[in-house]
């Protein structure tokens, strides 16, 4: 009897599941002009498969449905686009049927005023404020000297002259990126405050790509909780600065006093959301790119040899304590190529999201109002027509022609949403590489696993043995 009852329950579950899946497909298929695809379960869609399978999920659907298909991921019906020209047009069409369409989890955790989400006059004001903080003149006169001093000091402890040391380069670059961001943005040095901020920021990052289910134990719940704590810490920091009247040479002070060259002064809420977004975006991109650059250089000795030569040439005529300057950075052509190739091959950013404000025609299909477009840049990064032999680490490809001006160059986004921190991020990674390759030699230790979806990471760390050069 028990076995019969179990069999009935299982059969009923199968029937109900099949009916739910079928009902969901029929519900969406009534909309005319949709691209082919599947929508998965009601409410959850295909999010679980998307997050678990990642690139395999995308490739399987591309083979079945073509380069434009529909799905339901991260809480919203979505059209995935893998065609370079269609993606370029989508990114360039803000205000003409498209607005930013990031998942609810990211909007909630980074804040409703985060620069990736706001539109219109507020976006112009916040982007203007951010560009004023990271414009070339600021990098040259203020940010680069700070970055240089930080990197020199931070990397000094990675090894000793008497012996080699095994380090987890993933953990090291995460700490480095976060401390560098905190130092530049809010003047926070290593200590109890940075430790408290670090703990919450690590939790916040995990919640940004998740289903917005606010239940204890979920990444979203933990991430949103971490945001509340971060907001409280930043509010206290702002209050203390106002009461002390002391001047601080950092981005937070510039935002509080009003950034030079901007018309509008941001509210405290907007400043806090901008600070959280700055730290989040700088931390994620810089730490991952730095880690993967070390990995790729370790695997490609010829590239490492040319990179070292470039940096030792810069050190010629400098005393050991001399900093690198703007002219040194501008001369790092191969370093820039290594950074761009790392971003491309590792696919640090998998894609960009837009949302339709009206029915939009795309490639003969009609994308309904309120749907998302997932500009899937991973496939563009691996397009053999744009990047011959795309799965090979080849930084020299970036020296052959000005790839940065190519209309399908999307390593830093596109359209009016091109990453405003592109250059300062490149400066940070280049400065890290300068001191790392001129001070150390290294080799990979053990068998390290690298995952590239939904974010690039080494689940058990990426261990290298470091020795003084």
Curated annotation (Swiss-Prot):
The chain crosses the membrane at residues 1-21. Pathway: Plant hormone biosynthesis; brassinosteroid biosynthesis. Heme binds at residue 419. One of its GO terms (cellular component) is membrane. The keyword Lipid metabolism applies. Its EC number is 1.14.14.-. It holds the Pfam family p450. It is found in: Membrane. Changing residue 111 to V: In brd1-2; dwarf and defective in brassinosteroid biosynthesis. GO terms for biological process: brassinosteroid biosynthetic process; brassinosteroid homeostasis; microtubule bundle formation; skotomorphogenesis. The keyword Iron applies. Its cofactor is heme. Expressed at low levels in all the tissues, but preferentially in the leaf sheath. One of its GO terms (molecular function) is heme binding. It catalyses: 6-deoxoteasterone + reduced [NADPH--hemoprotein reductase] + O2 = 6alpha-hydroxyteasterone + oxidized [NADPH--hemoprotein reductase] + H2O + H(+); 6alpha-hydroxytyphasterol + reduced [NADPH--hemoprotein reductase] + O2 = teasterone + oxidized [NADPH--hemoprotein reductase] + 2 H2O + H(+); 3-dehydro-6-deoxoteasterone + reduced [NADPH--hemoprotein reductase] + O2 = 3-dehydro-6alpha-hydroxyteasterone + oxidized [NADPH--hemoprotein reductase] + H2O + H(+); 3-dehydro-6alpha-hydroxyteasterone + reduced [NADPH--hemoprotein reductase] + O2 = 3-dehydroteasterone + oxidized [NADPH--hemoprotein reductase] + 2 H2O + H(+). Coiled coil: none annotated. It is a single-pass membrane protein. Keywords: Brassinosteroid biosynthesis, Heme, Iron, Lipid biosynthesis, Lipid metabolism, Membrane, Metal-binding, Monooxygenase, Oxidoreductase, Steroid biosynthesis, Transmembrane, Transmembrane helix. Induction: Down-regulated by brassinolide (BL) in the brassinosteroid-deficient dwarf1 (brd1) mutant. SUPFAM superfamilies: Cytochrome P450. Disruption phenotype: Plants show a range of abnormalities in organ development and growth, with deficiency in the elongation of the stem and leaves, skotomorphogenesis, root differentiation and reproductive growth. Treatment with exogenous brassinolide (BL) rescues the abnormal phenotype. Belongs to the cytochrome P450 family. Catalyzes the C6-oxidation step in brassinosteroids biosynthesis. May convert 6-deoxoteasterone (6-deoxoTE) to teasterone (TE), 3-dehydro-6-deoxoteasterone (6-deoxo3DT, 6-deoxo3DHT) to 3-dehydroteasterone (3DT, 3-DHT), and 6-deoxotyphasterol (6-deoxoTY) to typhasterol (TY). Involved in the organization and elongation of the leaf and stem cells. Not able to convert 6-deoxocastasterone (6-deoxoCS) and castasterone (CS) to brassinolide (BL). This is Cytochrome P450 85A1. The lineage of its organism: Eukaryota, Viridiplantae, Streptophyta, Embryophyta, Tracheophyta.
